Regions:
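Conserved ABC ATPase signature
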Residues: 138-142, 146-148
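Helix-to-loop junction immediately C-terminal to a conserved catalytic motif
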Residues: 52
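A short, proline-enriched helix->beta-strand linker immediately N-terminal to the Walker B motif
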Residues: 157-161
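Short coil-to-helix segment of the ABC ATPase nucleotide-binding domain corresponding to the Q-loop/switch region
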Residues: 98-105
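Conserved beta-strand-loop-alpha-helix hinge in the C-terminal portion
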Residues: 218-242
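Conserved ABC transporter NBD signature motif
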Residues: 60-68
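Catalytic Walker B motif of ABC-type/P-loop ATPase nucleotide-binding domains
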Residues: 163-166
Length: 251
């Protein structure tokens, strides 16, 4: 379980201090698929970065199973991140000079796992994400959707308890986005991995179980899916319209 308690984030510019996040309190249960939405500049990615240990809060705590992760020393934090967290970014972050097979395997290679175990895991995940025939290819030979599925396979190969995804469909066309989101949804259920995803897109968010809305650095509201994605999408759109801003701020 992940808990965020009284989290604040500020930045200083000359003599001025700007609040990015203010008094954030949040609890994420194991196995949940949560989206974070909000207007541009609301603090979505900053919150994601703090929860994923990429950034630190100015005040407040982030707990994973009652452990204050931001109190860990550098080596301990690196080990914790390696063992518990996976990342998916909008721009894939694949290594162009490595094959798809090697890109997926990289976290296990770094962890000094046995080669035969690595190969077994790579092939299993490549089949799951529908990219097995591309294992000997290189990133430049794949479409954006295929590259993002490679990134997703790499993110989960270490069996993390939680995956953070920052605008994972932002560079994809609608067909590729749907394919990736179906994979993430199935991955969430099959592997019981928690997913926290930042997105500006209502269609993308409709694949999650719960949506948290941030506005002006504060948690604004939350809605839960009833299990019907089309109904959830309509619910999201209605809420965006009622939040006092233009829908275009979010989409």
């Amino acid at each position: 379980m992940l808990k965020v308690i009284n989290l604040n984030k500020s930045i200083k510019n000359n003599k001025n201090t700007f609040k990015i996040l203010e008094n954030i309190n949040l609890e994420v249960k194991d196995g949940e698929f949560i989206s974070i939405m909000g207007p541009s500049g609301a603090g979505k990615t900053t919150l994601l970065n703090i929860m994923s240990t990429i950034d630190r809060p100015s005040e407040g705590k982030v707990y994973y199973d009652n452990e204050d992760v931001h109190s860990l020393k550098n080596k301990e934090l690196s080990r914790f991140r390696r063992d518990n967290i996976g990342f998916i970014f909008q721009d894939y972050n694949l290594l162009d000079n490595m094959s798809i097979e090697d890109n997926i395997a990289l976290p296990l290679v770094i962890a000094n796992e046995k080669p035969d175990e690595i190969q077994k895991e790579v092939e299993k995940l490549a089949s799951f994400f529908g990219i097995k025939k591309h294992l000997k290819s290189y990133p430049y030979e794949l479409s954006g959707g295929q590259k993002q599925r490679v990134a997703a396979a790499r993110a989960i190969i270490t069996s993390p308890s939680i995956i953070f995804a920052d605008e994972p469909t932002g560079s994809l066309d609608s067909k590729s986005a749907s394919e990736l989101l179906n994979c993430l949804k199935e991955m969430n259920k099959k592997f019981n991995v928690t997913i926290i995803m930042v997105t500006h897109d209502a269609f993308t968010a409709s694949y999650s179980d719960k949506i948290i809305f941030i506005k002006d650095g504060r948690l604004n509201t939350r809605i839960d899916s009833n299990g019907n994605r089309k109904d959830f999408f309509k619910q999201i759109m209605n809420l965006l319209t009622s939040m006092g801003g233009e829908v275009s701020e979010f989409i």
